[in-house]
Each structure stands twice: as C-alpha cells, then as structure tokens.
UniProtKB/Swiss-Prot annotation:
The encoding gene: rpsJ
Organism: Chlamydia felis (strain Fe/C-56) (Chlamydophila felis)
Gene3D superfamilies: Ribosomal protein S10 domain
PANTHER family: 30S RIBOSOMAL PROTEIN S10 FAMILY MEMBER
Subunit architecture: Part of the 30S ribosomal subunit.
Protein name: Small ribosomal subunit protein uS10
Listed GO MF terms: structural constituent of ribosome; tRNA binding
Length: 105
C-alpha cells in the first residue's frame, strides 16, 4: 500500500513587494530548517487596478488623475512537513501588510 504524501500550500498576497519577499524568505527558511522540502516561492501574476478620478469637484471634466494599486502574489508548497515544521510556522510572526492563506492537501 502506497503512503499518501502530505503537502501544505501557502499563498501570500500584499501590496508591498519587498515586504512580501521578506515574508516568503522567512517561511522558506523556517521550513527548510525543520527538515521539510520546499517548492517555491513561485511568483504569481500581479493584479493591477487603476482608478480614475476627477481632479476638481465642480468643473473641468477633462482634467483627471489616475491611481493604481498593484497586488503581488506568491505561492509556496511545503512537501512532507513534520510536526516541528507546523509548530515553527505557527510561531512565525508576519507583518500586517501580508495576507496569508494556508491550505493542507
């Protein structure tokens, strides 16, 4: 009988690319230190949202200003995690600007 392999998939999302890269590096280093294999970080496509607003509250319809928000995403797969890996990931402190979703498969 074949033993089923365990995998943890972590998706990170944030507006600041530097903060996101530091967080992924922390997660990868923690997982490798506890003996798990790591696939990634895989950069996913960046979502770009552009908002156009009027510069003036009353007239000058042609005068507009554009703002954009870029959402950067990363994907990390942790293969064959141990109990130490899961405990270390729970104790890891991530910055407030990074959204994390963890899925066990």
């Amino acid at each position: 009988m074949k033993q089923q392999k365990q995998k943890i998939r972590i998706r990170l999302k944030g507006f600041d690319q530097g903060q996101l890269d530091r967080s992924t590096a922390d997660i990868v280093e923690t997982a490798k230190r506890t003996g798990a294999r790591v696939a990634g970080p895989i950069p996913l496509p960046t979502k770009r949202e552009v908002y156009t607003v009027l510069r003036s509250p009353h007239v000058d319809k042609k005068s507009r200003e554009q703002f954009e928000i870029r959402t950067h995403k990363r994907l990390i797969d942790i293969l064959d995690p141990t109990g130490k890996t899961i405990d270390a990931l729970k104790m890891l402190a991530l910055p407030a600007g990074v959204d994390i979703k963890i899925k066990a498969a």
